[in-house]
């Protein structure tokens, strides 16, 4: 290679001659000209590229081919190659491509060669496929179904054997066994190839071993903390007597780290700020699993000063009443992380109630390692007070915007208030139109204004339900219901119900408009017809009820209405009580009612906190006519208190009286009857009742009260399963007769299981009476259940 460099003024040129070393070909000239001496290096680079292109053009790849595939498409290989047409032959790059093809796992041999074709150089990769899987055989699997194993595998019949996928499949099958409790399961494989055939049988051999449960959970290293109390907060637990029912004792790998974090949190919540918790250790033995956690508690820290810093909107004294840490310090002198974190939320909500929607709360701790004391300072940045520009609804397909907006307690132009937003969410959830309600504050062009976006996810509000049910009073029955809670997307409730049994046949048609003209007034109507068969008489009824309700404040409702029934008593036994015989034939019942309800619970279907107070007063006969003259006030109070997630205390008390309203006795079916699964469990339905002194028939009481105390443990939240130990007691008596507490007060204890099933609430209760019966004998325990739809 030789040449010359020439410069004329500001321009220059380079002349280059490349000579064939063998002297066979003439010298090849190359020339380049540029302006400005500064471009000399780019000019040289360009000349080099021209020379390289000239001498490699004859070795450029004209095509890339794959040979030897039988089952696989050649594109499976070609799509993974980086070498393309026009690339120069590069041995290092080809070696990388061979490795890339080999790593696919489908081939037992890969070779590369270069051939000369009509269009130039052809790069050929020659492969030898591994056998095709024509059958998969599973040996030794009894506890896990073959279909489940095959479904978990990526290797399929008809595919080419791939060692990489096969290794993953063995791991998947092993994990499948682990999920079923077979932690010692060992899975191997072999390939049975037929001589001269391109296919083979893949055989999986499974050694299942014993199904293992957790036999011991160890918390090692504890000095001050109670091991039993620490174990109570773990999701993993030892196998016990009722594990077959509760599902405890099963090792779930995803819960190991969760429990390690739970122990750390428990230590922090009890003042052990420096606590260290090891990663969980799992030992598999022939008779069970041992799970161990090593804990180093460290010193326990007391609470020191509690203060506030930053942009405060109230005095320290007032803010101390907002947070819980100060009260915790008085009751328990040690630091608690969970209380401090709760305080962050409480302070954020407090500031939000004054319009500071984006207030930032940061808890700052100062630890004294010498004195083992922690000072806590809540640092607050209130940021901008904001107002609502617009309330927007998103996600509603069926429900109209006004149905959502009328439940909101915050509107366009209002100052943002966290309490009103939280109450709005509660109200929307209580409609039961939506499975999910979320709110989002969206900034606008003004710093002090936001749009409030209400995001709802609609759920199925209609139902067509049919079922077979049973109650101890109505016995076996068949029910059917057509119901819609959000008719036409306007929030109307409508239902048609039918029930047939040996004791009762009934039809009910109901309609409710909860917000007439989007106002506060609600209106409803119930039309019904029924036929009931009692021990001493039968009764046919046709009637209608109209009802109204109006909210009073945020949690209370006043209701009123009117009921008009025409009923007939017939087939009355000759020895029936006089009070029953007096009503033989057709009668008219004209009844007005007034009710008051205050409900502060957090949920209609699954309350965990709050109270319900109800009073229902009926006024029959007198100035509004009819044959039934009575006054019937009933009061009920319920309270819920959550002890821990899925653990709720529930108390209920109900009492009432029925009074004469003019002449005549109170009808027997307007009097009180208690006993059974809805009042005093362990006694027959409606069995706790005064009896006619002559006939011995139950004629109901005119004074009634009962109490239910329950501990609700939802042990399977996803299935809605709960165990409910209970204590019931109550009285039902006739005020005109002699009263004796020892005879009238009835008590029972027992256990109930509840299931929120797709067909409705199912209840299974076993109650044991604690008092003697009328005959002076001790009653035995009684099992009751109710299921299906009863009206």
UniProtKB/Swiss-Prot annotation:
BP GO annotations = membrane assembly
Q: Which Pfam families match?
A: Omp85, POTRA
Signal peptide extent = none
Protein keywords: Cell outer membrane, Membrane, Repeat, Transmembrane, Transmembrane beta strand
Gene Ontology cellular component terms for the protein in this record: cell outer membrane
For the POTRA domain, which residue ranges apply? Answer: 59-130, 131-209, 212-298, 301-383, 386-459
Kindly list the places in or outside the cell where this protein is found, as annotated in its UniProt entry.
Cell outer membrane
InterPro entries listed in its UniProt record: Bac_surfAg_D15, BamA/TamA_POTRA, D15-like, OM_assembly_BamA, POTRA
Q: Where are the transmembrane segments?
A: none
Q: What is stated as this protein's family in its record?
A: Belongs to the BamA family.
> Quaternary form?
Part of the Bam complex.
Q: Which NCBIfam families match?
A: OM_YaeT
Known function: Part of the outer membrane protein assembly complex, which is involved in assembly and insertion of beta-barrel proteins into the outer membrane.
Record protein name field: Outer membrane protein assembly factor BamA
Q: Which organism is it from?
A: Nitratidesulfovibrio vulgaris (strain ATCC 29579 / DSM 644 / CCUG 34227 / NCIMB 8303 / VKM B-1760 / Hildenborough) (Desulfovibrio vulgaris)
Recorded name of the encoding gene: bamA
